């Protein structure tokens, strides 16, 4: 073996561990078929496709291929309120899928929420799909560890999300770890450099540890990511036509609220520059901001999703909007799922919740 071969053997790359697709339906668009075929052959893969590109049908077809090939079910994990939506999508395309809340695994594809993973055994499944996989980084270490440990016991794995950020290296690391490639700390140590000269001293000073790509490692790093993931913002990224996927412009309207009171001990308000001042300003103006939002929501009669960040905001909005339902962190998983589904299905006109609770999949 020469030196070049020796170095090549040390190159990080996700090996193929899948199979040739056994079913490729006509309802998939050309770029979707390309991604699904690659993911099936890969065996353990991530599809980072932007909003509106059809991740759900791609994930269902991938899962159906694994189930048909192995004769065993595939577990399809989703955030709260997305499970029922996924089953409806499967029914629309004639794919056998059931929703399970108690660990039953009798279906071709078994759809369940991440929060119910403890009801299932990895030994019962040939494959697992993690929908909205960006949610992994929002889970606490124990929950994320449970999901990763479960996936490692299953031979075929697929991650899907529209929000994977190429500059969020931790997210790429947790995705790689869940798929069975490099763990996120192994990834950081191999490809990145800690910006603090002494991380222990930095932590003592309260500094946040930052990582940056080593200069010589940038190309190998992205080659490694491309060996197990595909990131697509539009079909033309893969050489296909964009015509059917041109989304309308997103309109953002900003509304200014005049504070009705001054900070304690102040003759006039000052700009809230620091985080402490911003938090105080948000708490001081809860009443004014909620009143403005409620006025707009009540005047339209249209479905509305209202994001809040403080419990006081959520409670105030719920009181000001008569037909609103609120999903809060203290609610049980069943209650959260019930209310999120009620909004998604049109049974509740207004939903009030925090982004960290309901942003995934709505």
Sequence positions of predicted segments:
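Conserved pre-motif I regulatory segment
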Residues: 7-48
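Conserved interdomain hinge at the start of the Helicase C-terminal
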Residues: 277-309, 316
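Conserved helix/coil segment N-terminal to the catalytic DExD/H
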Residues: 102-127
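Conserved helicase ATPase core of P-loop NTP-dependent helicases/translocases
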Residues: 305-307, 314-318, 322-358
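Conserved Walker A/P-loop ATP-binding site and its immediately adjacent core
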Residues: 56-61, 71-92, 166-171, 309-311
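Conserved helix-turn-beta segment of the N-terminal RecA-like "Helicase ATP-binding" lobe
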Residues: 81-103, 179-183
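Walker A/P-loop
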Residues: 42-62
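Conserved P-loop NTPase motor "coupling/switch" region that bridges the ATPase
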Residues: 72-73, 127, 135, 144-236
